[in-house]
Amino acid sequence: MTCALQPGRPSGGAPWTAEPAAFYEPGRAGKPGRGAEPAAPAMYDDESAIDFSAYIDSMAAVPTLELCHDELFADLFNSNHKAGALELLPGGPARLGGPGPAPRPLKREPDWGDGDAPGSLLPAQVAACAQTVVSLAPAAQPTPPASPDPPRRSPAPPAPGPARDKAAGKRGPDRGSPEYRQRRERNNIAVRKSRDKAKRRNQEMQQKLVELSAENEKLQQRVEQLTRDLAGLRRFFKQLPGAPFLPGAGAADAR
C-alpha cells in the first residue's frame, strides 16, 4: 500500500500518521476515448445545408404538381443514400475497453452541393410529373361525395280550389267598363241594405226600451197604490173594538 507523509508535523517523538494518497492513472484523467483518437471526425463535419430555393422555383412553374410532391421528395432524399450511406464510427466499442455490443450502422448525411445529381434530375422529374398530370386531367372525373345529400323534392303545384280562384279573380275589370259600374252598384246596394237593417234593429231596440220603461212605471204606480190600500186597511182594523170573532186581533195589535 502506498503511503505519503504529511509535512508540517512536529518531529519530537510523535508518530507520523500514514494516509493513502490520491494517485490517478494518467490515462483516465479525461473522458474516455477523447485523447486516444485525435483523428476522429467532428460531430457536424458530415452535415451540410440544403438549398431548397431551386426546388421551390421549379415546382412553382407547374401549377398542378400537388400529386407529385411526395414522389419528388422521396426520390430527392433517397437518390444519394444508395451509394454507401451506412458506415461504422471508427473505434466505437473498442475505445471503452472490453468487449461491447455489436457495432451499429450509423446513417450519414450525404454531402450535397448545388451541382449534384438531385438538382440535375429534378427538372426531368418535374417535366414527367407535369405531363402525367396534364394527361390525367381531361380523363379525371369528379368523385362522388362520401355521404350524398338526399334528393330534394320539387314543391308540388298548389291544388286548385276556391282560394286560388279567388286570388286569380282579384284583378277586376277597368273602371270605365260597364261591368265595373254594375259591380259597384251591387256593392252600394248591399251596403245600403246592411245599413238600413242595422238602423231598423236599433229602432226596434229603442222602441222596446220605451215600452219596457212605460210598463215599469205602471208597475211602480200599482205597487204604490197597493201600499196605500194596505195602510188604510190597517188603520181601519185598528179603529174597530175587539170582537169575539176576531181572537187574534189583540195579538196582532200587540205585535
Curated annotation (Swiss-Prot):
Region Basic motif, residue ranges: 181-208
Localization per Swiss-Prot or TrEMBL: Nucleus
Compositionally biased intervals (Basic and acidic residues): 163-187
One Gene Ontology biological process: DNA-templated transcription
Record InterPro entries: bZIP, bZIP_sf, C/EBP, C/EBP_chordates
One Pfam match: bZIP_2
Cross-linked residues, Glycyl lysine isopeptide (Lys-Gly) (interchain with G-Cter in SUMO): 107
Annotated region described as Disordered, given as residue ranges: 1-42, 91-121, 138-206
One Gene Ontology cellular component: nucleus
Keywords attached to this entry: Activator, DNA-binding, Isopeptide bond, Nucleus, Transcription, Transcription regulation, Ubl conjugation
Region feature Leucine-zipper, mapped onto this chain: 212-240
Superkingdom of the organism of origin: Eukaryota
CDD domains in the record: bZIP_CEBPD (cd14714)
Molecular function (Gene Ontology), one example: DNA-binding transcription factor activity, RNA polymerase II-specific
Leader peptide range in chain numbering: none
Location of the bZIP domain: 177-240
Skewed-composition ranges (Pro residues): 141-161
Subunit structure: Binds DNA as a homodimer and as a heterodimer. Can form stable heterodimers with CEBPA, CEBPB and CEBPE. Directly interacts with SPI1/PU.1; this interaction does not affect DNA-binding properties of each partner. Interacts with PRDM16.
Family membership: Belongs to the bZIP family. C/EBP subfamily.
Role according to the record: Transcription activator that recognizes two different DNA motifs: the CCAAT homology common to many promoters and the enhanced core homology common to many enhancers. Important transcription factor regulating the expression of genes involved in immune and inflammatory responses. Transcriptional activator that enhances IL6 transcription alone and as heterodimer with CEBPB.
The protein, known as: CCAAT/enhancer-binding protein delta
Gene coding for it: CEBPD
